[in-house]
């Protein structure tokens, strides 16, 4: 008899805080169908547990999330991956409890969408960030639903268009993070203590206020961003970009 598969997202509750830990280091916590399903289940469990006041989203290993699982990118329905990502981000935004990202590693592409969907976000000195889509023949379409309502426009343009890596201090400056910290545990604790003092109703209704613009963006642009992502993933340039990435070589257009 086969042993049950190890969870890709671990769920733990302590002192009114549910911690969801992305735990698939073999593929850098890439957004596979299985990982996203477990993430959404964890969020649903936290939503229905009256003892949970807030959720922390964190990771094992040196990568918070590498973005899409490229091994699944061309299987079946081309809209499946972006639709899955949009659903996961929206589940975070719509959860009637604050979600706090705790990052101390690399965040790429779709992983930035998860951070952007969170209400608060803290990253440590090992945090690095990059919108790598532009170097793969893609665009950060789906993740923009959660990110563009929150980011400084000039900062978004710089990092979206260059695909370059930036650190936690810059991520805080452009509005991706609440705090860039030397010690994420120390930075997180006063935030969580404050959330524990707040009423469940107060948190839910206040979160509804501060996420209203983000949710309007999801409702207005969600389907078009899914369609754009699917179209780009199926393009010749994106196929070359992803092939080059997997083969660890420059794409044909790189100068």
Model-derived segments and spans:
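Glycine- (often His-adjacent) and acidic-residue-rich active-site loop
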Residues: 51, 59-91, 107, 217
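Short helix- or helix-capping micro-motifs
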Residues: 66-68, 155-164
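Glycine-rich beta-to-alpha active-site loop
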Residues: 91-136
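C-terminal long alpha-helix characteristic of the crotonase
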Residues: 122-127, 177-223, 230-231, 236, ...
């Amino acid at each position: 008899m086969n042993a049950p598969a190890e969870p890709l997202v671990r769920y733990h509750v302590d002192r009114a805080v549910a911690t969801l830990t992305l735990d698939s280091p073999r593929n850098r916590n890439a957004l596979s169908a299985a990982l996203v399903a477990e993430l959404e289940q964890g969020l649903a469990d936290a939503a229905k547990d009256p003892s949970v006041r807030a959720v922390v989203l964190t990771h094992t290993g040196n990568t918070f999330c590498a973005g899409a699982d490229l091994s699944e990118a061309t299987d079946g329905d081309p809209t499946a991956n972006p639709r899955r990502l949009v659903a996961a981000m929206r589940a975070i935004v719509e959860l009637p409890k604050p979600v706090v990202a705790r990052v101390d590693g690399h965040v790429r592409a779709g992983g930035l969408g998860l951070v952007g969907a969170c209400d608060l976000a803290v990253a440590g000195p090992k945090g690095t960030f990059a919108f790598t889509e532009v170097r793969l023949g893609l665009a950060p379409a789906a993740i923009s639903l959660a990110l563009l309502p929150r980011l400084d426009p000039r900062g978004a343009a710089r990092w979206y268009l260059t695909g370059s890596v930036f650190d936690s201090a810059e991520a805080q400056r452009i509005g991706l993070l609440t705090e860039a910290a030397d010690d994420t545990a120390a930075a997180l604790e006063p935030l969580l203590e404050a959330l524990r003092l707040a009423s469940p109703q107060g948190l839910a209704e206040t979160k509804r206020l501060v996420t209203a613009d983000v949710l309007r963006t999801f409702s207005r642009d969600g389907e078009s961003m899914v369609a754009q992502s699917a179209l780009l993933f199926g393009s010749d340039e994106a196929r070359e970009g992803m092939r080059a990435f997997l083969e660890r070589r420059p794409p044909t257009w790189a100068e």
